[in-house]
């Protein structure tokens, strides 16, 4: 992986893209709580004719800590990351906590964005107390619960086991901080001021951030688009990767220069 020194942090990332169409904005992918860049499937990371940058937030994946427990602080890290890459204009895509980061970024730095894609997100992201406390006090059982609730009930066991293994590679204190960041996130009152083109994506069987939250976002962000994906839960981009990639491709075409 490549890495960038950003202030007192090092951010690792992978860059993808050949035969890039200069009229299409680059895509920056931000993972969710306790995740890393591999939470984005190959179909999304390897979009045709598009430069794609998938980062590991500090304390996640190949990026050393410290992490943070505040969405706006993560948003500033993303800002510094794209500054270091000299990306003046791009589409920011985020899953779950990454979706909160994308919304926060759009509200703070709209002039930098071509668009955002929020996958499995919400304007408010309260985390249930058993998950918050369990991450610290019973990591094994809590990560198993998170995994179960992150997928459609009919998802093959092997696929869920792979996700669980990735999740358990994370530092419990980093995952706890991520959940605190999500729990304190609330932009309900600010949604009417969001002017960045937005695509909201959610699995119809999402039990972590139910579809109603994406529908709410769509109804309160003018001109936004909504994709509800059947046979998918919270990790919709892993469960139905081609459908999510195709929708992102179509959305990119609309916001290209």
What residue spans do the PLM features occupy?
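Conserved alpha/beta-hydrolase catalytic His-Asp/Glu region
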Residues: 133-195
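Catalytic histidine-centered segment of alpha/beta-hydrolase-like enzymes
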Residues: 232-245
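Short beta-strand/loop motif that positions the catalytic acidic residue
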Residues: 194, 200-202, 206
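Flexible "cap/lid" loop of the alpha/beta hydrolase fold
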Residues: 100-144
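Conserved alpha/beta-hydrolase "nucleophile elbow" surrounding the catalytic nucleophile
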Residues: 31-33, 90, 94-96, 203
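Conserved acidic catalytic loop of the alpha/beta-hydrolase fold
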Residues: 73-90
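Conserved HGGG/HGGXW glycine-rich cap/lid loop of the alpha/beta-hydrolase fold
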Residues: 9-64
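Catalytic histidine neighborhood in serine/cysteine hydrolases
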Residues: 219-234
